[in-house]
Regions:
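Acidic, Ser/Pro/Thr-rich low-complexity regulatory regions
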Residues: 1-231
Length: 231
Protein backbone atom coordinates (compact mmCIF):
# COMPACT_ATOMS: atom_id res chain seq x y z
CA UNK A 1 0.00 0.00 0.00
CA UNK A 2 1.56 3.32 -1.04
CA UNK A 3 1.19 6.59 0.84
CA UNK A 4 -1.57 7.95 -1.41
CA UNK A 5 -3.75 4.88 -0.88
CA UNK A 6 -3.07 4.86 2.85
CA UNK A 7 -4.03 8.48 3.42
CA UNK A 8 -7.12 8.22 1.22
CA UNK A 9 -8.41 5.24 3.18
CA UNK A 10 -7.54 7.16 6.34
CA UNK A 11 -9.55 10.26 5.39
CA UNK A 12 -12.32 8.17 3.80
CA UNK A 13 -12.59 6.16 7.01
CA UNK A 14 -12.92 2.97 5.01
CA UNK A 15 -11.06 -0.29 5.57
CA UNK A 16 -8.22 1.44 7.43
CA UNK A 17 -6.63 -0.62 10.20
CA UNK A 18 -3.60 -0.15 12.44
CA UNK A 19 -1.97 -3.00 10.53
CA UNK A 20 -2.18 -0.96 7.30
CA UNK A 21 0.16 1.67 8.75
CA UNK A 22 2.57 -1.02 9.89
CA UNK A 23 2.59 -2.68 6.46
CA UNK A 24 3.24 0.73 4.86
CA UNK A 25 6.25 1.20 7.14
CA UNK A 26 7.57 -2.26 6.32
CA UNK A 27 7.28 -1.56 2.59
CA UNK A 28 9.31 1.63 3.05
CA UNK A 29 12.00 -0.34 4.89
CA UNK A 30 12.11 -2.85 2.03
CA UNK A 31 12.60 0.08 -0.36
CA UNK A 32 15.62 1.26 1.63
CA UNK A 33 14.12 3.92 3.90
CA UNK A 34 16.06 4.07 7.18
CA UNK A 35 14.17 6.80 9.06
CA UNK A 36 14.04 5.93 12.79
CA UNK A 37 10.31 6.62 12.99
CA UNK A 38 9.68 4.14 10.17
CA UNK A 39 11.65 1.48 12.04
CA UNK A 40 9.64 2.17 15.18
CA UNK A 41 6.31 1.96 13.36
CA UNK A 42 7.31 -1.25 11.57
CA UNK A 43 8.34 -2.77 14.91
CA UNK A 44 4.74 -2.50 16.12
CA UNK A 45 4.04 -5.68 14.17
CA UNK A 46 5.52 -7.62 17.08
CA UNK A 47 3.11 -6.08 19.58
CA UNK A 48 0.23 -8.28 20.69
CA UNK A 49 -2.24 -6.72 20.65
CA UNK A 50 -1.29 -3.75 18.46
CA UNK A 51 -2.00 -0.43 20.20
CA UNK A 52 -3.87 1.80 17.69
CA UNK A 53 -3.03 4.96 19.64
CA UNK A 54 0.69 4.14 19.58
CA UNK A 55 0.51 3.37 15.87
CA UNK A 56 -1.16 6.74 15.24
CA UNK A 57 1.50 8.55 17.26
CA UNK A 58 4.31 6.85 15.37
CA UNK A 59 2.59 7.47 12.03
CA UNK A 60 2.47 11.19 12.79
CA UNK A 61 6.19 11.01 13.63
CA UNK A 62 6.83 9.39 10.24
CA UNK A 63 4.91 12.16 8.49
CA UNK A 64 7.01 14.78 10.25
CA UNK A 65 10.37 13.06 9.75
CA UNK A 66 9.82 12.28 6.07
CA UNK A 67 8.40 15.72 5.30
CA UNK A 68 5.15 14.27 4.02
CA UNK A 69 1.85 16.13 3.98
CA UNK A 70 -1.59 14.79 4.76
CA UNK A 71 -4.33 16.06 2.43
CA UNK A 72 -6.77 18.39 4.13
CA UNK A 73 -9.92 17.16 2.40
CA UNK A 74 -11.47 14.03 0.96
CA UNK A 75 -11.49 15.19 -2.68
CA UNK A 76 -7.77 16.03 -2.68
CA UNK A 77 -6.98 12.65 -1.12
CA UNK A 78 -9.12 10.85 -3.70
CA UNK A 79 -7.44 12.60 -6.63
CA UNK A 80 -3.99 11.85 -5.21
CA UNK A 81 -4.91 8.19 -4.76
CA UNK A 82 -6.42 7.90 -8.24
CA UNK A 83 -3.42 9.64 -9.79
CA UNK A 84 -1.01 7.32 -7.98
CA UNK A 85 -2.76 4.31 -9.51
CA UNK A 86 -2.35 5.80 -12.99
CA UNK A 87 1.27 6.73 -12.32
CA UNK A 88 2.04 3.23 -11.08
CA UNK A 89 0.61 1.86 -14.32
CA UNK A 90 2.58 4.34 -16.44
CA UNK A 91 5.75 3.34 -14.59
CA UNK A 92 5.08 -0.35 -15.21
CA UNK A 93 4.05 -1.39 -11.70
CA UNK A 94 0.50 -2.13 -12.85
CA UNK A 95 -0.85 -3.53 -16.09
CA UNK A 96 -3.11 -1.16 -18.07
CA UNK A 97 -6.26 -3.21 -17.47
CA UNK A 98 -5.43 -3.51 -13.76
CA UNK A 99 -5.39 0.28 -13.65
CA UNK A 100 -8.77 0.42 -15.37
CA UNK A 101 -10.20 -2.10 -12.90
CA UNK A 102 -9.01 0.08 -10.01
CA UNK A 103 -10.51 3.21 -11.58
CA UNK A 104 -13.86 1.53 -12.18
CA UNK A 105 -13.91 0.25 -8.60
CA UNK A 106 -13.41 3.80 -7.33
CA UNK A 107 -16.15 5.05 -9.66
CA UNK A 108 -18.47 2.33 -8.38
CA UNK A 109 -17.71 3.16 -4.74
CA UNK A 110 -18.01 6.92 -5.18
CA UNK A 111 -20.63 8.29 -7.57
CA UNK A 112 -19.11 11.74 -7.11
CA UNK A 113 -16.85 13.37 -8.15
CA UNK A 114 -17.72 12.61 -11.74
CA UNK A 115 -14.11 12.72 -12.95
CA UNK A 116 -13.93 8.93 -12.85
CA UNK A 117 -16.58 8.83 -15.57
CA UNK A 118 -13.63 9.43 -17.88
CA UNK A 119 -12.82 5.76 -17.35
CA UNK A 120 -16.40 4.53 -17.61
CA UNK A 121 -16.72 6.28 -20.97
CA UNK A 122 -13.41 4.79 -22.15
CA UNK A 123 -14.44 1.24 -21.29
CA UNK A 124 -17.81 1.76 -22.98
CA UNK A 125 -16.11 3.03 -26.13
CA UNK A 126 -13.65 0.14 -26.17
CA UNK A 127 -16.59 -2.25 -25.87
CA UNK A 128 -18.47 -0.49 -28.66
CA UNK A 129 -15.39 -0.86 -30.86
CA UNK A 130 -15.20 -4.59 -30.10
CA UNK A 131 -18.84 -5.23 -30.99
CA UNK A 132 -18.65 -2.71 -33.85
CA UNK A 133 -21.65 -0.58 -32.90
CA UNK A 134 -22.34 2.85 -34.35
CA UNK A 135 -22.89 4.50 -30.96
CA UNK A 136 -21.20 7.74 -30.04
CA UNK A 137 -17.51 7.48 -29.23
CA UNK A 138 -16.17 9.88 -26.64
CA UNK A 139 -12.71 8.66 -27.63
CA UNK A 140 -13.04 8.55 -31.40
CA UNK A 141 -9.81 10.54 -31.82
CA UNK A 142 -7.83 7.69 -30.25
CA UNK A 143 -6.92 4.39 -31.86
CA UNK A 144 -9.48 2.28 -30.01
CA UNK A 145 -8.18 -0.88 -31.69
CA UNK A 146 -5.15 -0.59 -29.38
CA UNK A 147 -6.79 -0.58 -25.94
CA UNK A 148 -3.62 -0.57 -23.84
CA UNK A 149 -2.22 2.45 -25.69
CA UNK A 150 -5.55 4.23 -25.18
CA UNK A 151 -5.48 3.45 -21.47
CA UNK A 152 -2.00 4.96 -21.14
CA UNK A 153 -2.98 8.10 -23.04
CA UNK A 154 -6.10 8.56 -20.91
CA UNK A 155 -4.07 7.96 -17.74
CA UNK A 156 -1.69 10.78 -18.72
CA UNK A 157 -4.64 13.11 -19.23
CA UNK A 158 -6.31 11.98 -16.01
CA UNK A 159 -3.20 12.71 -13.92
CA UNK A 160 -2.96 16.19 -15.45
CA UNK A 161 -6.63 16.87 -14.72
CA UNK A 162 -6.24 15.75 -11.11
CA UNK A 163 -3.41 18.25 -10.64
CA UNK A 164 -5.57 21.32 -11.33
CA UNK A 165 -8.75 22.84 -9.94
CA UNK A 166 -11.75 21.58 -11.88
CA UNK A 167 -15.26 22.99 -12.22
CA UNK A 168 -18.09 21.32 -10.35
CA UNK A 169 -19.49 18.21 -12.11
CA UNK A 170 -16.46 17.89 -14.42
CA UNK A 171 -16.51 16.30 -17.01
CA UNK A 172 -20.32 16.43 -17.11
CA UNK A 173 -20.15 20.02 -18.32
CA UNK A 174 -19.78 22.11 -21.46
CA UNK A 175 -16.90 24.58 -21.78
CA UNK A 176 -16.51 27.43 -24.26
CA UNK A 177 -13.04 27.42 -25.78
CA UNK A 178 -13.32 31.15 -26.56
CA UNK A 179 -14.78 32.86 -23.49
CA UNK A 180 -14.39 30.08 -20.90
CA UNK A 181 -18.10 29.95 -20.04
CA UNK A 182 -19.41 26.77 -18.46
CA UNK A 183 -22.79 25.13 -18.96
CA UNK A 184 -24.24 22.18 -17.05
CA UNK A 185 -26.57 21.18 -19.87
CA UNK A 186 -26.94 17.44 -20.52
CA UNK A 187 -23.68 15.85 -21.71
CA UNK A 188 -25.24 12.44 -22.45
CA UNK A 189 -25.58 13.26 -26.12
CA UNK A 190 -23.93 12.57 -29.45
CA UNK A 191 -23.46 16.32 -29.86
CA UNK A 192 -19.91 17.31 -28.96
CA UNK A 193 -20.04 21.02 -29.86
CA UNK A 194 -22.69 23.73 -29.60
CA UNK A 195 -23.17 27.50 -29.77
CA UNK A 196 -22.05 29.36 -26.67
CA UNK A 197 -24.97 31.28 -25.15
CA UNK A 198 -22.51 33.61 -23.43
CA UNK A 199 -20.30 34.88 -26.27
CA UNK A 200 -22.31 33.57 -29.24
CA UNK A 201 -19.40 31.55 -30.58
CA UNK A 202 -20.47 28.99 -33.16
CA UNK A 203 -19.50 25.45 -32.09
CA UNK A 204 -17.20 26.83 -29.40
CA UNK A 205 -19.10 25.24 -26.49
CA UNK A 206 -17.54 21.80 -26.09
CA UNK A 207 -18.86 18.70 -24.35
CA UNK A 208 -16.05 17.71 -21.96
CA UNK A 209 -17.10 14.08 -21.98
CA UNK A 210 -15.10 14.00 -25.23
CA UNK A 211 -11.38 13.27 -24.86
CA UNK A 212 -10.15 15.83 -27.39
CA UNK A 213 -12.10 18.66 -25.76
CA UNK A 214 -10.55 17.87 -22.38
CA UNK A 215 -7.13 18.15 -24.01
CA UNK A 216 -7.97 21.66 -25.21
CA UNK A 217 -9.42 22.46 -21.79
CA UNK A 218 -6.11 21.46 -20.19
CA UNK A 219 -4.10 23.59 -22.60
CA UNK A 220 -6.32 26.58 -21.86
CA UNK A 221 -5.89 26.10 -18.13
CA UNK A 222 -2.13 25.80 -18.41
CA UNK A 223 -2.04 28.95 -20.53
CA UNK A 224 -3.85 30.88 -17.79
CA UNK A 225 -7.37 31.06 -19.22
CA UNK A 226 -10.03 31.56 -16.56
CA UNK A 227 -13.68 30.62 -16.20
CA UNK A 228 -16.66 32.92 -16.05
CA UNK A 229 -19.97 32.30 -14.33
CA UNK A 230 -21.99 29.31 -15.61
CA UNK A 231 -24.42 30.18 -18.38
Amino acid sequence: MDFAELVFKRIDESWIKAQDYIEWANELLEDGCEAPSIWQLAACSSDVPVDPDEVERLFQSCISELGLELPSDWYTALCAYSSSICENMLQGSLLPWECVTEMLAIADDHNEPYIHWIWIDLVDDLHRTTVKTTSVHFYSTLNLSDPEACIRIVAHQFVSLCSISLPERFPWIWHCEVCGAISKENTFTEVNSDTCTSCGGISTMKNLRFFEHRDVFLKNRHSGSSFVAPC
